[in-house]
From Swiss-Prot:
Regions of compositional bias (Pro residues) in chain numbering: 269-280
GO biological process per UniProt: cell migration; cerebellar neuron development; epithelial cell migration; mRNA destabilization; negative regulation of translation; oogenesis; post-transcriptional regulation of gene expression; regulation of cell growth
Induction record: Down-regulated by E-cadherin.
Organism for this UniProt entry: Homo sapiens (Human)
Protein name listed in UniProt: Nanos homolog 1
Domain observations: The Nanos-type zinc finger is composed of two C2HC motifs, each motif binding one molecule of zinc. It is essential for the translation repression activity of the protein.
Chain intervals for the UniProt region annotation (Essential for its translational repressor activity): 40-56
Family: Belongs to the nanos family.
InterPro entries attached to this UniProt entry: Nanos/Xcar2, Nanos_sf, Znf_nanos-typ
Protein's job: May act as a translational repressor which regulates translation of specific mRNAs by forming a complex with PUM2 that associates with the 3'-UTR of mRNA targets. Capable of interfering with the proadhesive and anti-invasive functions of E-cadherin. Up-regulates the production of MMP14 to promote tumor cell invasion.
Keyword Disulfide bond belongs to the record: no
Known disease link: Spermatogenic failure 12: An infertility disorder caused by spermatogenesis defects. It results in decreased sperm motility, concentration, and multiple sperm structural defects. Non-obstructive azoospermia, oligozoospermia and oligo-astheno-teratozoospermia are features observed in SPGF12 patients.
Length: 292
């Protein structure tokens, strides 16, 4: 978050408020203190917001939605929370909107509003994931897994393992991590897409036929419809190109399966024998010289 220079709201108020810090209770409160020793947790603050708000409304008497409150001890917590959180509910001192809104500073009680416990005392413990006992039993763990299923990239009970909600799974994960070095371990959810991608590419290569190209016809500027229908030579070395098979080498006379051009003819690579010098005679001597 960007920090902007603070400007006093009135000439009377000349000192800046203490620095703010985000804590797992999803509230901006004063700098770290004994009331909020835990670090910021994205699972508690963002992904589990619906669960946390529901549990906070069910268990907080300040909102007027406490279990068994208002003479409705037999009503389930979900009905009370839904009626309290309904947009048609009238605004009042116990409504959820004003309670969860940003704290309103009053110029007359500056000293009281700056205390760390005054702003988050009624939400500090109610919105804690561990304090709400979401993972107390198998039913609660399953409910939490369902809530995080669509938001989490992990499948099955991996979300419960990450949140510490499955003791057996957590113990198994701890044993595996102790037995296997950190460098050799790779999460299954990260390796599985790569395997699928690799297998898909290999299958595509196997199913897609390779394009046949005859280099002889292509180099001779033949049409693409012609040089993409065959190849020059087969695996056994025989010539398969119909154009080259009809060609006859002028040096050795080869054609058909052994057809080739002059450039690749074996006779063209043999150096010609050196020319013999003519026999020396009197006629070959330089003019003007007489032989004795």
């Amino acid at each position: 978050m960007e920090a902007f220079p603070w400007a006093p709201r009135s000439p009377r108020r000349g000192r800046a408020p203490p620095p703010m810090a985000l804590v797992p209770s999803a509230r901006y409160v004063s700098a770290p203190g004994p009331a909020h020793p835990q670090p910021f947790s994205s699972w508690n603050d963002y992904l589990g917001l619906a669960t946390l708000i529901t549990k906070a409304v069910d268990g907080e008497p300040r909102f007027g939605c406490a279990r068994g409150g208002n003479g409705g001890g037999g009503s389930p917590p979900s009905s009370s929370s839904s009626s309290c959180c309904s947009p048609h509910t009238g605004a009042g001192p116990g409504a959820l909107g004003p309670a969860l809104g940003p704290p309103d500073y009053d110029e007359d009680d500056d000293d009281d509003s700056d205390e760390p416990g005054s702003r988050g005392r009624y939400l500090g413990s109610a919105l804690e994931l561990r304090a709400l006992e979401l993972c107390a039993g198998p039913a609660e763990a399953g409910l939490l897994e369902e809530r995080f299923a669509e938001l989490s990239p992990f499948a099955g009970r991996a979300a419960a393992v990450l949140l510490g909600c499955a003791p057996a799974a957590a113990a198994a994960a701890t044993t595996t991590s102790e037995a296997t070095p950190r460098e050799e371990r790779a999460p299954a959810w990260a390796a599985e897409p790569r395997l699928h991608a690799a297998s898909g590419a290999a299958a595509a290569r196997l199913l897609k036929p390779e394009l046949q190209v005859c280099v002889f016809c292509r180099n001779n500027k033949e049409a693409m419809a012609l040089y993409t229908t065959h190849i020059l030579k087969g695996p056994d070395g025989r010539v398969l190109c119909p154009v080259l098979r009809r060609y006859t080498c002028p040096l050795c006379g080869a054609s058909g399966d052994n057809a080739h051009t002059i450039k690749y003819c074996p006779l063209s690579k043999v150096p010609p024998p050196p020319a013999r010098p003519p026999p020396r005679s009197a006629r070959d001597g330089p003019p003007g010289k007489k032989l004795r």
